């Protein structure tokens, strides 16, 4: 693999924020995911003077690396209208659980939130 690309991460830059969205690899290496998706993104933000890095939704491993759990939104296209009501009910119920999980996950950050 020497000198060959074995992984890539896709980032988008908008305003003062870098957004990490997708990644893939051809071979597995310890910590490659973190290097490609987080550490290189952080380094780019510092070099480019960006004030925010949004590494994407999900992934409890992000909390250990100091990424605060934040709410995000998604859109769903439901082809068969018969599922619309069931999906809407589930989404409404899930909302409370997601908010509770966000608060619980924030307690796992390697630093304290709020003013000193």
Regions found by a protein language model. Give the residues of each.
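Aromatic (often tryptophan-rich) hydrophobic motifs at membrane interfaces
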Residues: 1-89
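In a subset of proteins, long, contiguous C-terminal domains/tails are tracked
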Residues: 79, 84-116
């Amino acid at each position: 693999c020497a000198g060959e690309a074995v992984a890539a991460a896709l980032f988008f830059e908008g305003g003062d924020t870098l957004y990490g969205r997708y990644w893939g690899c051809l071979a597995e290496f310890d910590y490659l995911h973190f290097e490609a998706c987080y550490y290189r993104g952080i380094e780019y933000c510092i070099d480019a003077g960006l004030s925010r890095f949004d590494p994407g939704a999900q992934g409890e491993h992000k909390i250990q690396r100091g990424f605060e759990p934040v709410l995000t939104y998604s859109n769903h296209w439901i082809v068969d209208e018969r599922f619309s009501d069931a999906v809407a009910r589930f989404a409404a119920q899930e909302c409370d659980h997601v908010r509770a999980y966000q608060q619980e996950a924030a307690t796992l950050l390697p630093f304290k939130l709020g003013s000193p």
